[in-house]
Amino acid sequence: MTKHQNLPVPRSAALLLAALLLCTACGKREWPTPVASEDKFRWRSVEVQRNQGCVILNCELSGNWQNLDTVNVLLEPVGTAPGDGCASCPFTPRSTLIFAPGAAGLRKDMNRVAVTACELDPQKTYRVQVVGFSVFPGISPVASELMLSAPK
Protein backbone atom coordinates (compact mmCIF):
# COMPACT_ATOMS: atom_id res chain seq x y z
CA MET A 1 0.00 0.00 0.00
CA THR A 2 1.42 3.34 -0.99
CA LYS A 3 0.88 6.32 1.04
CA HIS A 4 -0.09 9.49 -0.85
CA GLN A 5 0.82 12.68 0.77
CA ASN A 6 -1.64 15.45 0.11
CA LEU A 7 -0.23 18.93 0.04
CA PRO A 8 -2.04 21.34 2.25
CA VAL A 9 -4.11 23.87 0.33
CA PRO A 10 -2.07 26.96 1.30
CA ARG A 11 1.18 25.29 0.23
CA SER A 12 -0.19 24.18 -3.15
CA ALA A 13 -1.68 27.64 -3.74
CA ALA A 14 1.71 29.20 -2.99
CA LEU A 15 3.41 26.84 -5.46
CA LEU A 16 0.83 27.65 -8.13
CA LEU A 17 1.26 31.38 -7.53
CA ALA A 18 5.07 31.08 -7.72
CA ALA A 19 4.82 29.15 -11.01
CA LEU A 20 2.46 31.76 -12.44
CA LEU A 21 4.76 34.64 -11.44
CA LEU A 22 7.78 32.82 -12.84
CA CYS A 23 6.08 32.28 -16.20
CA THR A 24 4.92 35.88 -16.54
CA ALA A 25 8.42 37.18 -15.76
CA CYS A 26 9.78 35.37 -18.84
CA GLY A 27 7.87 37.56 -21.31
CA LYS A 28 9.38 40.01 -23.79
CA ARG A 29 10.33 43.34 -22.25
CA GLU A 30 10.93 46.58 -24.07
CA TRP A 31 10.85 50.29 -23.39
CA PRO A 32 7.56 52.06 -23.96
CA THR A 33 7.25 53.34 -27.50
CA PRO A 34 5.63 56.65 -28.39
CA VAL A 35 2.26 56.58 -30.09
CA ALA A 36 2.82 58.67 -33.21
CA SER A 37 -0.77 59.88 -33.44
CA GLU A 38 -0.64 61.23 -29.88
CA ASP A 39 2.98 62.41 -29.65
CA LYS A 40 3.44 64.20 -33.00
CA PHE A 41 3.55 67.94 -33.58
CA ARG A 42 3.42 69.98 -36.77
CA TRP A 43 4.28 73.47 -37.92
CA ARG A 44 1.04 75.48 -37.90
CA SER A 45 2.74 78.57 -39.32
CA VAL A 46 6.27 79.79 -40.06
CA GLU A 47 6.98 83.46 -40.82
CA VAL A 48 10.33 84.60 -42.22
CA GLN A 49 11.92 88.01 -41.63
CA ARG A 50 15.33 89.37 -42.59
CA ASN A 51 17.53 91.66 -40.53
CA GLN A 52 20.94 92.37 -42.06
CA GLY A 53 22.76 89.01 -42.22
CA CYS A 54 20.13 87.14 -40.19
CA VAL A 55 16.99 85.19 -40.96
CA ILE A 56 14.43 85.33 -38.16
CA LEU A 57 11.86 82.56 -38.13
CA ASN A 58 8.73 82.97 -36.00
CA CYS A 59 7.04 79.60 -35.79
CA GLU A 60 3.85 78.28 -34.25
CA LEU A 61 3.37 74.59 -33.49
CA SER A 62 0.24 72.52 -33.09
CA GLY A 63 -0.29 69.02 -31.78
CA ASN A 64 1.95 67.81 -28.98
CA TRP A 65 4.37 70.76 -29.24
CA GLN A 66 5.97 69.92 -25.87
CA ASN A 67 7.83 67.11 -27.65
CA LEU A 68 9.87 69.51 -29.83
CA ASP A 69 13.56 68.97 -29.10
CA THR A 70 16.03 70.14 -31.76
CA VAL A 71 15.33 72.56 -34.61
CA ASN A 72 17.36 72.52 -37.84
CA VAL A 73 17.29 75.41 -40.30
CA LEU A 74 18.14 74.36 -43.85
CA LEU A 75 19.42 77.16 -46.09
CA GLU A 76 20.08 77.41 -49.81
CA PRO A 77 21.36 80.66 -51.33
CA VAL A 78 19.62 81.58 -54.58
CA GLY A 79 21.60 83.41 -57.24
CA THR A 80 24.10 83.13 -60.07
CA ALA A 81 27.28 82.62 -58.05
CA PRO A 82 28.97 79.20 -58.05
CA GLY A 83 27.31 76.96 -55.48
CA ASP A 84 24.04 78.92 -55.51
CA GLY A 85 20.76 77.26 -56.29
CA CYS A 86 17.90 78.60 -58.35
CA ALA A 87 14.36 79.40 -57.22
CA SER A 88 12.77 76.82 -59.53
CA CYS A 89 15.32 74.01 -58.96
CA PRO A 90 14.80 71.21 -56.44
CA PHE A 91 15.68 72.35 -52.93
CA THR A 92 19.30 71.46 -52.13
CA PRO A 93 20.34 72.96 -48.80
CA ARG A 94 23.92 74.20 -48.78
CA SER A 95 24.04 74.66 -45.01
CA THR A 96 22.21 73.31 -41.98
CA LEU A 97 22.13 75.22 -38.72
CA ILE A 98 21.32 73.04 -35.70
CA PHE A 99 19.61 74.56 -32.66
CA ALA A 100 19.59 72.23 -29.67
CA PRO A 101 17.46 73.06 -26.61
CA GLY A 102 18.98 76.06 -24.84
CA ALA A 103 20.97 77.20 -27.91
CA ALA A 104 21.66 80.92 -28.30
CA GLY A 105 19.49 81.42 -31.40
CA LEU A 106 16.49 79.38 -30.19
CA ARG A 107 13.70 80.73 -28.00
CA LYS A 108 10.66 78.64 -27.03
CA ASP A 109 7.53 80.02 -25.39
CA MET A 110 4.72 77.48 -25.10
CA ASN A 111 3.77 76.51 -28.68
CA ARG A 112 5.76 79.37 -30.25
CA VAL A 113 9.36 79.07 -31.36
CA ALA A 114 11.65 81.87 -32.56
CA VAL A 115 14.86 80.94 -34.36
CA THR A 116 17.51 83.47 -35.38
CA ALA A 117 20.04 82.20 -37.93
CA CYS A 118 22.85 84.67 -38.64
CA GLU A 119 26.13 84.95 -40.55
CA LEU A 120 24.31 85.01 -43.89
CA ASP A 121 25.14 87.17 -46.89
CA PRO A 122 22.80 90.18 -46.47
CA GLN A 123 22.69 90.69 -50.27
CA LYS A 124 21.52 87.15 -51.12
CA THR A 125 18.09 85.59 -51.28
CA TYR A 126 17.74 82.28 -49.42
CA ARG A 127 15.37 79.39 -49.60
CA VAL A 128 14.65 78.26 -46.05
CA GLN A 129 13.09 75.20 -44.46
CA VAL A 130 12.65 74.46 -40.75
CA VAL A 131 12.84 70.86 -39.51
CA GLY A 132 11.74 69.93 -35.99
CA PHE A 133 12.91 66.81 -34.21
CA SER A 134 10.94 65.13 -31.46
CA VAL A 135 12.26 64.10 -28.06
CA PHE A 136 11.20 60.59 -29.12
CA PRO A 137 13.69 59.18 -31.66
CA GLY A 138 11.01 56.89 -33.13
CA ILE A 139 8.97 59.81 -34.45
CA SER A 140 9.95 61.20 -37.85
CA PRO A 141 11.26 64.77 -38.17
CA VAL A 142 8.67 67.38 -39.19
CA ALA A 143 9.59 69.76 -42.03
CA SER A 144 7.94 73.09 -42.75
CA GLU A 145 6.98 74.35 -46.16
CA LEU A 146 9.79 75.78 -48.28
CA MET A 147 10.04 79.58 -47.92
CA LEU A 148 11.89 82.30 -49.79
CA SER A 149 13.70 85.03 -47.85
CA ALA A 150 14.80 88.03 -49.89
CA PRO A 151 17.08 90.79 -48.56
CA LYS A 152 15.48 94.02 -47.36
Kindly label every feature range from the protein language model.
Residues T2-A14:
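Bacterial N-terminal signal peptides that target proteins for export
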Residues A117-I139:
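Beta-strand-rich modules
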Residues K28-K40:
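Proline/serine/threonine-rich low-complexity linkers at boundaries of modular beta-sandwich domains
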Residues G53-L57:
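Structural beta-strand segments of beta-rich domains
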Residues L61-Q66, S134:
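Extracellular acidic, Ser/Thr/Pro-rich low-complexity tracts
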Residues T70-D121:
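Recognizes extended acidic, P/S/T-rich segments that occur
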Residues V135-K152:
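Extracellular fibronectin type III
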Residues L22-A25:
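C-terminal motif of bacterial Sec signal peptides marking the signal peptidase cleavage site
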